[in-house]
């Protein structure tokens, strides 16, 4: 399930700040029930956190962002926001006025998607981005299969990286994340594709990676 969250900015103390990925993660986790929030936050493998999100888009005193994930997680978040719609994302205090479900993918044979993904290998004990498209395709498939298993969804999914550009973004103080802006051709079984599209493609989606949009 993918939702658009929008509303008003009550206060913002750092006018130069534009990247809120770490703050969005903290806000999202804080608005989930226990033990769901603890279970997600304490997972050893960040590869299988079944949600992702966009940055916050700001215009004047308005904001919006997108959050996408497994239905039970998103519905839990919505339920808690209905109880208290004032949230904090780092230096901002926001009042959420509207939550609107986004349209699901229409069933077809293949999809052209764009967005930012992480696909890594471990070298000398450190995670490094994969370089070759073939290796990235295989890793995206492997991670997707792991997520589908957790979701009890059967089905095949295949990836083909058509274009990629290396990006480095600030996550929080002292931590920068390397990823690829990609154009992906995705094919396979509709149910598998639909669920992976919702929960995020690739690794480390809880940092705001893996939110893809159909071209």
Predicted regions and their residues:
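RNA-interacting cores
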Residues: 1-215
